[in-house]
Amino acid sequence: MANYAVGDIQGCYKEFDKGLKKINFNEKKDRLWISGDLINRGPDSLKTLERIYNIRSSVNIVLGNHDLHFLARHYADRKAAKNDTLEELLSSSKCEKYAKFLLKQPFVFSKKIKLKNGDKKKYIMVHAGLPHYLTFKECMNLNKLSQEFLSKNPKKNLKKIFFHHRKNNFKIVSMKDKLTFFINAVTRIRICNKEGKIMFAFKKGLKDLPYNFIPWFKLKISALTRDDRLIFGHWAALNGKTNKQNIIGLDTGCVWGNKLTFVRLEDSKKYFIKKIK
């Protein structure tokens, strides 16, 4: 049995399928961790989601911002974005089934894994990152509440999530506002200042950091002990590089013409699938 992680498939089905073959993924024995953004912008969102759904008993998923965007388009009449490739999925007879499947998925997932050297290591998976001041217990509690919040009334609460997506302060009295901030933070964060204020609009690379802002993972992450490891996607401009041994970037920009990356968690071995032209 092995645990493999992959990030930001974004509907790049050919590369995803080739990657599963390259790692010899066995759905009866292995586990696949997907760090969000399963769909959108790539050419085969429906086919990708269908494949993941068919092996769902062998998959751990966290939601990403593109997954939320799809849910908002399906449930809350959110307008299409310029580069959306969701029409085939949205018009499919299976759309509601797949939407309900995604609504059940968490924003943060964690599990202990036995490494090849025999040690046990706790892995935490999130799409974009974690606010540095939240403890692991706080993150998992907010994750549970956020799942309940989203699934209870998808139409109303998805609108609230996207309406409040520019709020960047966790010091909010309302629990609903706190949950919408948490959801936006874990699915969108790239950079923040030393106090944890997030600049949600930033999408560039490390050479273009605004003054007094740093990558979120440069701060001491309260949820992460020195023995834990965290895996995330979302930030393609990093090309998977964080310069931190215990924080692993998975998004290597397949949808932008680069590659899809799989990581075997037991020994951190990486498998690369170049974009298929």
Regions found by a protein language model. Name each.
Residues 1, 24, 52-54, 109-120, ...:
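A short acidic-Thr-Gly-centered motif at the start of a beta-strand
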Residues 1-55, 68:
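N-terminal active-site segment of His-dependent metallophosphoesterases
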Residues 3-10, 123-129, 248-250:
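Active-site-proximal beta-strand elements of phosphoester/diester hydrolases
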Residues 10-14, 40-42, 67-72, 132-133, ...:
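Active-site environment of divalent metal-dependent phosphoester hydrolases
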Residues 31-36, 79-87, 198-207:
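Short, basic, glycine/proline-bearing loop/turn elements
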Residues 46-50, 54-173:
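Active-site neighborhood of divalent metal-dependent phosphoester bond hydrolases
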Residues 140-277:
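Acidic, His/Gly-rich catalytic cores of divalent-metal-dependent hydrolytic chemistry
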